[in-house]
Amino acid sequence: PVQHSTQRPARFRSLAIFSLLIAMGIGMALTGCAGLPENVDRPVSRALADPSGTALASMVQEQKAAAKARHPSGFVLLSGAQAAYSSRLALVESAQKTLDLQYYAIHADVSTQRLLQSVVAAAERGVRVRVLLDDLHSTGRDAQVMRLAFVPNVEMRMFNPLTGARNSHLGRIFSMVGDFSRMQQRMHNKLFIADNTLGIAGGRNLGNAYFGNDDAGNFVDLDVLAAGPVVQELSQTFDAYWNNPRAYPVQSLISRHQLLEMQAS
């Protein structure tokens, strides 16, 4: 009878376990003893209370009167990537008072660069900008999106942040091991609201793959452009997350100098 040796598989199992322990050790080293900051200053802020004096509000009222609409709120589906992108860009360029952006992921790529440049331009002309971003994907190159927080008139908060080194994917992964219950509570909301009058909600995050610009593959998503009082309800959900204790101002997590060092490395 043919006998099969069990020594080789056993040796491989030992090597696999040893490699895993090494990886865990490296991960813990990269994570270090860092924790979330305490006694963080989170000034409470709310959506624009009275949007009636803005150009967008006037436009909505004119469109409503022309259409003889019976319902105070209106909706338009944005099924195409180009319509989804140009609509967001138009909201930024038309905003006079406030912009509120809430996303699960914002990628630092060509599509987002142009959009965020417009957001910065809006802040420079006096628009109050609030950006709320889930922290799971804000590592490596995408961490540079957090530089928005250091632009005047822009406030940026990270929801439910991880504690691992932001320039290490492995460190970030291992930071979740000891606090998995909290770490799996991610913020998948996606809102883009201008002057508390017009808002976009749907499946798209911000990045090339959501706007048909990724050569490797693109997501097929659907958005809704909403107008009228329903937008104020969207803003209420934004405010609830924005003022939540799990929303940390970027400045409490990382400095501008650290972001620049990451970019240079």
Regions found by a protein language model. Name each.
Residues 2-265:
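N-terminal localization/anchoring segments of enzymes in phospholipid and broader phosphate metabolism
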